[in-house]
Amino acid sequence: MSWQQVDDPEKVESWFLRDTPVFEILEELSPRRDEAVFDKLAMSAFAGTPLEMALRDLGIRAFAIAGVALEIGIAPTVWHAVDLGLIPVVVTDACGGRDHSAMQRVLDDFRFSGDPLLTDVATITRLLAARPSSEAGP
């Protein structure tokens, strides 16, 4: 309710209804045919989805994460990943948010704990480009 700035549960509206424009994946970010897409059902992308099992089945122990709402969507996923023994790499300048002071608190918490790694788009792009082709994946 606080995110939508309403004081009555009856006034809360779902913003991300399947098959609506706000739910669509941008063309520039469209997954390849060999990439899986999981609908995020809760604050953490791991809650109610097969994401953890998929990552473990593929032998993935670390992953990059970015998105629209650092303070309400990305942070819960990052902390859940840490609890699961995974290494989240937060691409800080590819994370948006509505409440800048809350975003700063989240980043400060990440830095304080040392569990998630923090990077920026330029660094992760350079590192991914430098990978040998055998590591590049499909």
What positions do the PLM features span?
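Active-site-adjacent betaalpha module
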Residues: 2-138
